[in-house]
C-alpha cells in the first residue's frame, strides 16, 4: 500500500523507494527438513524495471519453530569469519535490510525440523527510482561464496530437490 511504502521510506531512510510490480525473485518461500541456503549476496538489478535493489523484506509465518532446528536467517561479515546476527523464522518476525554488495546472508545449516514442520515466509524487494550505474557494483545475479573444499561455487538444490542452481542463476 502507499502507506506501507511511505513507512518503509522513512524507517529505512531510502527516498524514492519503489515496489516491484513484477515481483522478480519475490513471493512465497517454503523450506523443508534438510534444506539450506548458502551464504550469498542478493542480485542487485531488476531488468524489468531498470532499477537497483535498495531493500529486502522477509515476513515469516512459520506456525511453530524451535531454534535447535536451524533455519535462522544469518547475516555474515564479508570475510566469512562468522555470523554477525541471526533471526529465527518465527511467526510474525519481519526482517528488513538495505542492499549492500557485501550484505552476505543465508541459512547455511541444514534444517533439522520434524518431517511435518517447515519454514515459511514471504519475501519482497524494493528498488531505488533514481538508480545510477555504480561501476564498483555492476548489475549482477545472486553471488555465492566459493567452496574451497569442493573447488567450485556453492550450489543450491532447487525447492523440489531436482537439479542445481549455480552462482549464475537466481
Where are the predicted features?
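Beta-rich nucleic-acid/ligand-interaction surfaces
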Residues: 24-38
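Short, conserved, surface-exposed binding loops centered on an aromatic residue
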Residues: 16-20, 29-30, 46-51
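A broad, low-specificity signal for short, low-complexity segments enriched in glycine/proline
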Residues: 14-23, 56-59, 81-88
Amino acid at each position: 500500500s502507499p502507506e506501507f511504502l511511505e513507512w518503509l521510506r522513512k524507517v529505512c531512510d531510502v527516498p524514492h523507494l519503489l515496489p516491484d510490480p513484477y515481483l522478480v525473485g519475490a513471493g512465497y518461500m517454503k523450506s523443508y527438513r534438510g534444506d539450506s541456503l548458502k551464504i550469498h549476496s542478493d542480485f542487485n538489478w531488476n531488468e524489468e524495471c531498470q532499477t537497483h535493489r535498495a531493500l529486502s523484506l522477509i515476513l515469516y509465518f512459520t506456525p511453530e519453530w524451535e531454534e535447535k532446528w536451524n533455519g535462522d536467517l544469518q547475516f555474515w561479515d564479508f570475510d566469512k569469519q562468522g555470523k554477525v546476527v541471526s533471526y529465527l523464522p518465527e511467526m510474525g518476525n519481519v526482517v528488513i535490510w538495505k542492499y549492500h554488495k557485501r550484505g552476505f546472508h543465508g541459512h547455511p545449516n541444514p534444517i533439522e525440523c520434524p518431517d511435518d514442520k517447515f519454514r515459511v515466509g514471504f519475501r519482497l524487494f524494493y528498488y531505488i527510482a533514481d538508480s545510477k550505474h555504480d561501476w564498483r557494483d555492476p548489475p549482477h545475479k545472486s553471488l555465492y561464496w566459493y567452496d574451497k573444499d569442493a573447488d567450485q561455487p556453492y550450489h543450491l538444490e532447487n525447492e523440489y530437490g531436482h537439479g542445481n542452481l549455480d552462482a549464475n542463476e537466481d
